A protein has these predicted regions:
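Peptidyl-prolyl cis-trans isomerase
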Residues: 1-149
Length: 149
């Protein structure tokens, strides 16, 4: 499981590179400052940041490099997800599902409709991520050194 996660991360980093994505210093700073484990009274606390990193035997530079990679892989996934949209036939399918619910209250019907559309879109986005991930496996060279495990 851990090995699969490492391979997937490597592939998504490769995809991000191919897409020309990057992480700005400002993006990285914001992401770190928003992490609750580095906050005190709802605000970023530099001392908590340094102390927690030291407790985990990390330097700020090594942690920030890992964090930047995480942000980059998430950006690559978002590019794929944002490229997905429901087709007219999928909208029609969603409308059919909405009409089957038979909700008479207009407010509840609107909420149900939105939930169904979002659910269908989410499912399609997940399929797109899986398909893209599978296609990357043939393009990205991954070498596993079993003797090092």
């Amino acid at each position: 499981f851990v090995l699969e996660q490492l391979i997937a991360k490597h592939m998504w980093l490769h995809a991000a590179e191919e897409m020309g994505l990057s992480v700005s210093d400002e993006d990285l700073r914001k992401a770190i400052m928003q992490r609750t484990e580095f906050q005190k009274n709802g605000n970023f606390d530099p001392e908590s940041y340094r102390r927690l990193l030291a407790a985990n035997r990390l330097t700020p530079a090594s942690f920030e490099a890992m964090e930047a990679k995480d942000i980059l892989t998430n950006k690559a996934r978002l590019v794929i997800m944002d490229a997905v949209a429901l087709t007219p036939s999928e909208y029609a399918e969603a409308q059919t599902l909405v009409s089957r619910e038979g909700e008479s209250d207009p407010t509840k019907a609107a909420i149900a409709k939105e939930r169904i559309f979002q659910n269908l879109l989410f499912q399609k986005q997940q399929r797109a991520l899986m398909a893209y991930s599978e296609s990357m496996k043939s393009k990205v060279p991954v070498k596993i050194h079993k003797e090092l495990m």
